[in-house]
Amino acid sequence: LSGKTITQVFNATKPHKFTFYNGEPSEYGKLLVGKTILSSEGYGMFVNFNLSDNVIMNIGDGVSVRYYNAGDKIPANYQLLLTFNDDSFLVFTVVMYGFINVYPDSYIDNKYYKLSRESISPLSDKYTEAEFEKLVAEAKKTLSAKALLATNQRIPGVGNGVTQDILFNARINPKQKVLFLSDNQKEVLFNALKETLVDMTFEGGRDTQRDLYGNAGGYKTILSAKTWKNPC
């Protein structure tokens, strides 16, 4: 996408009450048309498209982005669509909920984004067992193992979808309270967290998600919408 200039912005054909924007999405055209994509970068559950003139387009959580070549059929339903100077286009859709934000001055006012920027990625070697122990120690003891991993972006980028397989690999009941996790269970959970996320990343994402070109990830999910009907 780098080097492409935005020529038009089309708003939602199917409004979605759990798609969150900053300001009025009807004003996005004024902010985006004429801007060139310079680069992109990810922080936890967020992705930034860095544009010319210090504009940032920031998407998060359940936003699916799909790139289409010139002449491809335009999907009937979307939450935002951008066309480029080569007539290719980018489509943003939301299934459950997600953020599609545009910031004209590079300042992103979102507490979860700030948390993701300031936290250590669980894929990093710097995310050690000591970091995980600190997270557990600071959590409310009434919190469940699933909530510890999947809520409030305690671990950048980790949400409900990946948590299912992490807990399964750790052999820990999602409802088990943090208070009752033994030292051995904490160690096993930490290792499952690291190893499961590495596997998902190495395989190009989960098979329930698609990349920019519509290709499904290569990681075969253990627990997901694809597998819930299957026997254990």
Q: Which functions belong to the PLM regions below?
A:
Residues D61, V65, Y113, E118-S121, ...:
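Flexible, active-site-adjacent loop/turn segments at secondary-structure boundaries
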Residues T7-E27, E41, F46, E133, ...:
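Basic, nucleic-acid-binding surfaces and adjacent catalytic neighborhoods in DNA/RNA-processing proteins
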